[in-house]
Amino acid sequence: MQALRTAASGMAAQQLNVEVISNNIANMNTVGFKRQRAEFQDLLYQTIERAGSQSSSDGNIVPTGVQVGGGVKAGSVYRITEQGTPTLTDSPLDLAIQGKGYMPILLPSGETAYTRAGNFSTNDQGQIVTEDGYLVQPGITIPQNATDITISKSGLVQVKLDGQPQPQTVGQIQLANFLNEGGLEAIGDNLFLETAASGAATLAAPGEPGFGMLLQHYTEASNVDAVSEITALITAQRAYEMNSKVISTADQMLQATSQLRS
C-alpha cells in the first residue's frame, strides 16, 4: 500500500527536522552559531488520470486530473545568517562582527577556514589564536611587554608598550565575504570551509563596502531563539505522530483486506 511508504517518508523527514532543531537548541550558547532550518520537497506523483485528457465515458476534457503524491524528501538544511546579539566581555581580544563577514583562520592542514566566533586569545608565542589554538589570519603577534591592546572597528590592532607613550601598530585583521554564505561547509569548532557553491572568498578590511565592522570586547551570541525552536520542535513532533498514525491506519486496512480475502 502506497500510504505506508508515504507515511514512512514523512516520519523520516520529521526525524531529520527534529535533529536539526535539537542541534540548534544544543548550540544556544555557542559563540557565533547560526541556527539552521530543514526544507522539504514532495516526491514523484502517480498519475491516475491526466489533467486535460478526455474522459473515457463521454469524451469531455478532464479539468483537474487525478494525481497521488508519493511522500516527502529532504531538500536542504540551510543556515539562517541573521546577526546574533553582541555580548560584552572583559577580554580585549574578543571580537564581534557587526554585519557581514568571516574571520580567516589557518588550520594545521594549511587550509584556510572561516569563523564568526571571535573569542580569541594568545598562544605561548603571543600569536592571536582561536580557542583550539588555530592562528587568525593574517598572523598577528602581541608583544609580551604590551600593557594595552586596542582593536579598531576597521580591524587595526595597536598595543601600548612599557616605556613608550605612543601605541604601536602590530597588525590588521581582515574579513572574508562570500557570494553564497549558504554554500559554506561547516566542519565544527565554529569553522567553515569555502566550497564551489559558496564561491571564492573576497578579503577586505572591516568597514569596507559590503563588509561588517569589528566590536572589541564583544562576542556575537548564537542567533537561536528558544521559543521559536521549542515551537518548531512541538510542530515536528506532532507531524511525526500523525505520520505514525497513518501507518497504523494503513496497516489496519491491510489486515481488514486480508481477512476479507480469506
Curated annotation (Swiss-Prot):
Pfam assignment, any one: LlgE_F_G_D1
Listed name of the protein: Flagellar basal-body rod protein FlgG
Annotated localization: Bacterial flagellum basal body
Cystine pairs: none
Domain of life: Bacteria
Keywords: Bacterial flagellum
GO CC terms, sorted: bacterial-type flagellum basal body, distal rod
BP terms from Gene Ontology: bacterial-type flagellum-dependent swarming motility
Assembly notes: The basal body constitutes a major portion of the flagellar organelle and consists of four rings (L,P,S, and M) mounted on a central rod. The rod consists of about 26 subunits of FlgG in the distal portion, and FlgB, FlgC and FlgF are thought to build up the proximal portion of the rod with about 6 subunits each.
Main location: other
Family: Belongs to the flagella basal body rod proteins family.
Source organism per UniProt: Caulobacter vibrioides (strain ATCC 19089 / CIP 103742 / CB 15)
